[in-house]
């Protein structure tokens, strides 16, 4: 609420106090050549090291990067060592300047050149990797703009207004580095600023040039043309310096065009440190105020009025509502927000399992996270319906009279919308699918998971109406087979002109080539528990009219579940035969040395029990198939003994 996030700091780090600007530009150029690029931590460590190195200025007069590298402590943090290594290599590549020619006699002086024609521009023979790298005290060399240079400068000043301190600092560094001519400065102005700002700057520059020409400039010749023309001459470095200063001074008269709509909208957050809030205000004023405008009164006023209530109370109690900025920062230095952020200890989650879910059969989640409702474990104890829980039984709900359906209508889909609210007994729990109810003819039924009860004593056969589009619909009995990938229909349901394709089918009896055909015509299958037919784009055709199978392709469309109730049958006792060979004959015989003191009296009950005749036991019949084997305890079987052991087998 009211919190404005801080804007990034100035993209150009400021040089440490006591270091010349052209030396600091050398370090910046070397740092930006690092791969990957430098971070703010690298610049912080570089400035920290240079502050220490400036106490020994032996390396700076003239500058000697090798001597500076020897002052670097071993294991110094950051990438200062890499920056110094780049500077040492670059300094070794720069050729030494040739000595000036000796002065010639007055008798062999060359004729004076025409002052109206500037001398031609001479490209330097050896381009420098770092343009500002020059001996101490020597002026920089002129270098025209390149597109990448203009783009880099525009990116640096994109968040600052023309004439702001950040804008002027970047432009001054660029002018000092490239030593541009009047034409280069005009190109830079048109690339960075809008046409309105360029027009205002041009008017202010003309007035400053007129005042300077009237006042008089060292080296300016009125007969050689205007100052702009003479400043384009690379040899006239004095005039070019004067023109550059006038060009920079013309920005002071431009109106401030801040990026922020209002400085009053910069508010301190409830948990934001006070120094971070003041830093955001300082950056906003630097980007918006014209250079030369007093910033401290505005900054002190906003630092108090836009602070949060707790910091305002601290400043009022100590009498620093309009004090210097340092006193205000010290007053709120010990303030910490009362609302502590809660640390949530999140239990690490296990990776999703690869096995299928026990409820829906899909992999990728645990069964406790499954979105499918839990199916009932068995039929309802009240109505014996296997499709719902006891709490959802319609016998526990008030009956609603329903109109009788038409005689020829098939069983409709299970409805998803219930006309009366559910009455959940014993509270909570997972809800099961709605009960099997008739849907009104004027309602739109929606299909949910139907449960098909089957008799385990019979084959899973269901009556279905087949429409092959080439003959009249026919009703047949089809086998429900969840192991068949495709539906199989007899060829008697199709007309003689139905297009069929040969295909090979792999079944339990092996692979067949000519028993089944493949049809590409759509087939409609109407099941008794669905109103909408199942549409199959293709199916198998049995040429011998032996099979009619509803496969998985049809069952998946209706999302059916086969319910097989458990049948209670009496246990059947069947004899089993024990193996004659145990499979342990390859092991060595045990030693005959007595290893343990055995008590013969303690083993008599076991011998007595093992000598009893065969015992039979009948277990209580339980649902499902359960096998219980009983055998006689006897001595280990000798090799070649083929005696068998019989016992009861309970199914």
UniProtKB/Swiss-Prot annotation:
Q: Where is the active site?
A: 481
Q: Where is this motif: PTAP/PSAP motif?
A: 124-127
Lipid attachment site numbers (N-myristoyl glycine):
2
Q: Which UniProt keywords apply?
A: Aspartyl protease, Capsid protein, Eukaryotic host gene expression shutoff by virus, Eukaryotic host translation shutoff by virus, Host gene expression shutoff by virus, Host-virus interaction, Hydrolase, Lipoprotein, Metal-binding, Myristate, Phosphoprotein, Protease, Repeat, Viral nucleoprotein, Virion, Zinc, Zinc-finger
Does Protein biosynthesis appear among the keywords? no
ZnF CCHC-type residues are: 355-372, 378-395
Task: Reply yes or no: does the keyword Protease apply.
Answer: yes
Locus of motif PPXY motif: 118-121
The UniProt record lists the Peptidase A2 domain at: 476-554
What's the superkingdom here?
Viruses
The record's EC number reads 3.4.23.-
Q: Which Gene3D superfamilies match?
A: 1.10.1200.30, Acid Proteases, Delta-retroviral matrix, Human Immunodeficiency Virus Type 1 Capsid Protein, Zinc finger, CCHC-type
| Record region (Disordered) | 93-142, 631-651
Named from the GO MF annotations, one term is:
aspartic-type endopeptidase activity
Site note Cleavage, residues = 130-131, 344-345, 449-450, 574-575, 582-583
One GO biological process term: proteolysis
Q: Which PROSITE patterns match?
A: ASP_PROT_RETROV, ASP_PROTEASE, ZF_CCHC
What Pfam family is a match, any one?
RVP
Q: Which residues carry this modification: Phosphoserine?
A: 105
GO cellular component assignments: viral nucleocapsid
Amino acid composition bias (Polar residues), ranges on this chain = 641-651
Extra info from the record? Answer: HTLV-1 lineages are divided in four clades, A (Cosmopolitan), B (Central African group), C (Melanesian group) and D (New Central African group).
Q: What is this protein called?
A: Gag-Pro polyprotein
